[in-house]
Amino acid sequence: ALWRGLQSGNLQTTATDHCCFCADQKAAGKDDFRKIPNGTGGVENRMEVLWHHGVSTGRLTMNEFVAVTSTNAAQIFNVYPRKGSISVGADADIVVWDPEATKTISAKTHFQKVDYNIFEGMTVKGCASHTLSQGKVVYADGKLDVERGAGRYVHRPPFASYYEALQIQAQRNQPTPVKR
């Protein structure tokens, strides 16, 4: 059902509830599941897993992948075309994707500060080869090179036109009375 939602456009984005807790912290709930801290790491491998199970299998096109991982979120958060597009005047935040690259996901090699990975041992086809942030290469061929504090606030104007379009669509889908 989720794949059909992405394919049809009823689901516009993909995300993770990225909230890392180490195995010892998770073990706090071994006798009472209510004490298990919620969340797990997922943001680092989200795009790889989505490409592998989506584009590589034919469930999604490359354009749909870009939409659900970037463009749609930028539109929803009203930062498009500054974010979510490669165009004149846009921020130079770009992921260069190698659709043929393969990788086996492991906690031993990930960048997250947690001692396990929910995708441990999964081999995926399709990975980022380079990432640029503000025009600077911050990831290349498996090596991360970021400066602490290099991020910056991105102003979000209110009232994205995206929501207006959703309201118009909802109005059009309302039942219309038939006079008899």
Where are these regions (language model features)?
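Phosphate/diphosphate-binding loops
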Residues: 1-2
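His/Asp/Glu-enriched, well-ordered alpha-helical/loop segment
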Residues: 7-14, 19-101
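C-terminal cap of metal-dependent C-N hydrolases
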Residues: 28-32, 88-153
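Short, surface-exposed, polar/charged, turn-prone segments marking secondary-structure boundaries
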Residues: 41-44, 122-127, 158-161, 165-168
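Short, positively charged
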Residues: 63-64, 105-112, 165-167
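Intein/HINT protein-splicing elements and their conserved insertion hotspots or analogous self-processing inserts
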Residues: 141-180
